[in-house]
Amino acid sequence: MTTVHPGTGAPADAAAPQVLGPAPVPGRLARGIRTPDGERFLADLAGTRVRQNGCAAAAYAALYANVDVITAYPIRPYTAIMMNLAQFIADGLLDAEYIHADGEHSQFSAAFGAGSCGARAFTGSSGVGVTYGYEMYSIISGARIPIQMSIADRTLDPPGDFGSEHTDALCTRDMGWLLGWAATPQEVFDKSLIAYAIGEDPRVLLPQMVVQDGYFVSHIAGEVDMPSAEQVDAYLPPYQLPFPLDPRHPVSHGPQIHPEQGPPLQLERARAMEDAIPIIREKTDEFAEQFGRRYPHFVEEYMLDDAEMAIVISGGHAVTCRAAVRRLREQGIKIGMARLLWIRPFPTEDLQRALRGVKVAGVVETNLGLGGASYGGILSLDVTTALYQASGERPLVTSFMAGLGGETVPVSEFEWMAAKLGQALERGSVEKATHWVGFE
């Protein structure tokens, strides 16, 4: 038996590992082959614009990606993603194994096993489901198995209010997964394809979390442009894992090792996350060339050219933030918005460039980081670290706890944040590290 280090492939003197072709289930198609009904369905969709919510957009992206294995366990608000995929399989539109697990730990374990065999695997969850399967995150990324997980954010218990909050996904931020938020159903669809293309690239080989705000994005319909299957296949070819579990070419995954063998593997995983940065740029540009929709690589810069103040945000509340920025600009207030599209890898240099010239920045925290340095949220810890490393003048930074428990963040609250930033600009210092919006 040959032991293969994740990411290195088989030894040079060994026969080239082969990706398994037809799945060992009678009647299954070969990997990468669409069903006849699926081909006709996607042909009819090509070039159309449909109204669908974020859950449907994630499911359609998995259909276009022609995933091989889906592992599911229901928990709202992400459940509709798996309901749609189950219907696709029942209607003969998708040839995939659908595994209904007994809980999220088993669900993610099954996706890991499928991905280890060379299958394009898809899974997902929300809220406490994300945390229930926590053990598997480091295992999957450490084995360099690029499965995809679609998360519809939900508040952790307590208080059990089931609203949208980013804490669930951010709890996993240091486990070696690519992690990014989508702000609209169109972006959910597009980012799901982009994330697969990045994670499956042999220069990266990392799992991905594509996150959307529960209910605000997952359940509110928006317009989504549907491509042709040929476009998607050209951008995202059939997945080929360099080191699949294959009885014809045995390898070992996850063997026990000596302590001194551990640090090199951890270093390799850290470097893989750094190495993903140029690949994210590359795959985002390739997507624009193939589909005609261009996204910022890491940071959306909105009205920041001459801004003295900036709101730093991620997720769906950025849509409302843009409206607030436009209204404030009409009043002569020089404010802009920096939206983070990826949290891991964190876009340190891109954020530094986006906020150059800005004198004070406020980070919107739709999450809870109890006892942290700012005694508020999680995101500001990365933002302040990134800005502290910048050369020259750095903006003052404060944070705003808003949207917790799934509350809306209306334009009026963004205007309140802008007023606080304006006061800090006049004083030359921030009043406090964290403001709780609606409680002051």
Map each language-model feature to its residues.
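Thiamine diphosphate
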Residues: T2-C171, G176-W177, L193, D213
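Conformationally flexible catalytic loops at phosphate/diphosphate-handling active centers
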Residues: L20-R28, P207-E300
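Peripheral docking tails and interdomain loops at the edges
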Residues: G27-G32, E365-E440
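Glycine-/acidic-rich phosphate or pyrophosphate-binding loops and their flanking alpha/beta elements
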Residues: N53-A58, E286-M309, R322
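Short acidic, glycine/serine/threonine-rich loops at helix termini
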Residues: I81-N84, A110-G113, G133-Y137, P158-S164, ...
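Short helix-loop-beta junction
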Residues: A86-D91, E286, A323-M337, Q389
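Conserved thiamine diphosphate
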Residues: G163-G214, G392-E407
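Redox- and metal-dependent alpha/beta enzyme cores, enriched for Fe-S-associated oxidoreductases
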Residues: F298-I333, F346-R353
